[in-house]
Amino acid sequence: MEFSMKFNATARSVQGSSASRRLRRAGRVPAIVYGGTAAPLNIELDHNEIYHALRKEEFHALILNMVIEGGKTEEVLLRSVQWHAYKPQVMHVDFQRVEANQALHTKVPLHFINAEVSPAVKLSGAIISHVLTELDITCLPALLPQFIEVNLGDLLGGGSIHLADIKLPKGVTFNAHGGDTNPLIAAAVVKGGGAADEGDAAAEQPAA
């Protein structure tokens, strides 16, 4: 992995709703780390630190270095975040431990490039629709990509990009859902194309 992020955590011994409310009033966030061979670990985080970290795409996709107060570091993956119903407040966070020899099942963001120079945009004035913005994948921790690139440079007006059209990084496999092994990734929608097609079809009908 070429890029990593770290965050600070403190082990907590007090649990329960009342304790969690006290933590939040003090600017802290209750969280838990689970998985691997160790027992689940209840931790607390600084709200401002985790709030700003969660605004970064890579914090949701990469293996993170969790630095526990006292010097111990563990590799973890963000699994879920609970937000306040109407305030910009992080209520609870779940992390999963990472074991080097155990495959990860996670989602990785897609980065779309070269749309502006594609024939679809330059020649046809198409609008690029991103049908998927992330992929559900499986890989070993050392092979987890920060993102997967989708090159739209050759896309034609009315054309599309499917999973089979992009190259997955080494050691990364796609997790198919519902039997769809080649999902639609992006499509070039030509403005007014549908209406024009219907008009052409009508013009081709023989007169009664």
Swiss-Prot record:
Family according to the record: Belongs to the bacterial ribosomal protein bL25 family. CTC subfamily.
HAMAP family on file: Ribosomal_bL25, Ribosomal_bL25_CTC
Protein name, entry field: Large ribosomal subunit protein bL25
Gene3D superfamilies documented for this protein: Ribosomal protein L25, beta domain, Ribosomal Protein L25, Chain P
Pfam families, per database record: Ribosomal_L25p, Ribosomal_TL5_C
Source organism, top-level taxon: Bacteria
Cross-referenced InterPro entries: Rbsml_bL25/Gln-tRNA_synth_N (IPR020056), Ribosomal_bL25/Gln-tRNA_synth (IPR011035), Ribosomal_bL25_b-dom (IPR020057), Ribosomal_bL25_C (IPR037121), Ribosomal_bL25_long (IPR001021), Ribosomal_bL25_short (IPR020055), Ribosomal_L25_dom (IPR029751), Ribosomal_uL5_bac-type (IPR020930)
Gene Ontology CC: one annotated term: cytosolic large ribosomal subunit
